[in-house]
Structures are given as structure tokens and as C-alpha cells.
């Protein structure tokens, strides 16, 4: 089965060659690399010209990483599609492992894996669990694992590892557990579900793969297949916390909130996920002095913490000594509950 590799890029002239080179090392005859240039204003086109017909260069109007990926999917010629961001890098064995798994298990719609991070001169291995809001096992998230070698041949230089096949649609409510640059998916079987949101400021990949997971089974390969070059910076501001929680609520509503069958079985899980994001929004409002708005938000939260309710009612209470620290600690406790989606390090495209 051939693979179409989609690489969106925007003003990454100094970095895109690293991504393309890693994709060239990973592909096989019949595969293709589609680089979608989201109207870069730097020397990206010149940097890619050297590859000639080894890649398909496509320049599109500037509409963001989600739209660029969607364009790449629309012009893909092969039955399998993989994604790589232009500032990241694949490990050489990614397509060998994932393609063989999908060939061995035609009932699996897509697969993904762990990854490693390079940031500020440091390396962090097996990074995916850092996205989780609480400690949990791969068995808990994806179902019992089996050895990869029991499903497909292992490359000589790769030690055996576990593969977990299961319902990612349920798992993605609990945790952000799919890293886009490690995904290989059956294009035609995923159909319209394989589409990235173009109206969201972030988490468009989370929504996309939640929709894909609703269509069919996913497989998690417990090995590293990619390097993410992290853009670590200062702690998120309250405004950013608010915006991200708002986006998460939008996705919860659009994906799971309209799925009656899912809600009939997992309403408590869904409600807890929504509750967590509403508390994050309320906390940001309180820190910003928007007490009336925070009260409105807290009315939508079952059993809202006393510290939040007090801060929304008493003028100035939030900004007095230990009170603000108690609210900050409350946020940490909230995020430990099983529902949030951990912010991904690194930017798409």
C-alpha cells in the first residue's frame, strides 16, 4: 500500500529541509511527499526547489495548518496518508512499522505511536505520557497490548514492543493521546472524517482524529517514530488558558456532545470533561476580575469548588494573600481529574 506524506509549512525555510529529508529516508517506491506551502513569505519555495520531482510542491493561499493539511489530503494519490510538520522529523522506521501493521490488520483504520522531543538543547524520550492529565497505562487507554512481532515482521534493528488496538474515540475524551506526526491512516475508509478543522485556533488535530476514531479502530505502537522539536516557553497566561479551554469545549460539543449513542453510555465521563474546562474558564475570568461572567460560568458547573464560588461573590477576595494561592492550587487539582487534554508542545505546520 502506497503512502502519501503531507507536510504543511509556513515560513520555515530554515527548517523544512530537515523534515523533507527525514520523509525521504522513510518512504518506499510508489510513495509520495506532498509539501503544502501555506503562502510563505520567506525563502521556503527556493529551499524546496532543490528537491525537484522527489516531492510534490503545492502553494496555496494562507489559511492555516488545518487547511493546508486538508489540501494535501485532497490531492493525495495513495490509499494511506501520513502527516509530518515542517519543523519536526521522522525516525527512519516509521512507515515500515506502521504500513506493515495496517497490512496485517485490515480492520484497523489508523495507527499512531510515541515520540521523542528535542527542545532547548535537551532530549526527552517517550514523551506522549507528558500530555496526560493523570498517570494511566496504555492498557487502560487503548486496551491490552500484544507484541508487534506477533502481528508483523520487525526490522532487524528495532526491538519488539507492544501494540494496543482499541476504541480511541473513548480514549480521546479522557486524554490527548494521538500525536499527528506519528499517524498513518486509510484515506478512503476515513472519508470525510479525515478533515482538520479550519475554524479553530488550536487542537484541530485532536478534533480530526476523534472523528476518525469514531469511524474505526486505532492502533497505538508503543515505540518512538518521530522527533518533535518543542517550542517551550513561559507558562500559559490566564488568557491562553481561557482560550484553550473554550476551544476544548467547542470540540467536546461538536464531536461527542451530539453523539447520542456515546452519551447514553458515557455521559458521566463527558460531563466531567466539560466540567473541567468550565472551571478553567472560570478561574481565568476570576483572575481577570470578571466576577459576573465567572458566576455565570460556575452556574453551569455541578459542585463548583468553594474557593471559586467565594472568589466570584466577594470583591477583592481573589487578590488577597493566601486566597489567590488557594485558587491556583485548585486549578492544579482540577487538572489532575481524568478529563483534560494536555497542551501539546510545538506548533503545527
Where do the PLM segments sit?
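A conserved acidic beta->alpha catalytic loop
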Residues: 22, 37-46, 62, 85
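Catalytic core of nucleotide-sugar-dependent glycosyltransferases
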Residues: 224-232, 237-265, 286-303
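Conserved nucleotide-sugar donor-binding catalytic segment
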Residues: 113, 138-242
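Short, acidic, metal-binding catalytic loop of nucleotide-sugar glycosyltransferases
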Residues: 21-30
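Short aromatic/hydrophobic "clamp" motif used to bind/position activated sugar donors
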Residues: 81
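Acidic helix N-cap motif at the loop->helix transition within catalytic regions
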Residues: 17, 42-50, 89, 93
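Glycine-rich, basic loop-to-helix element that forms the pyrophosphate-binding segment
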Residues: 60-76
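Conserved donor NDP-sugar-binding/catalytic core segment of glycosyltransferases
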Residues: 93-147
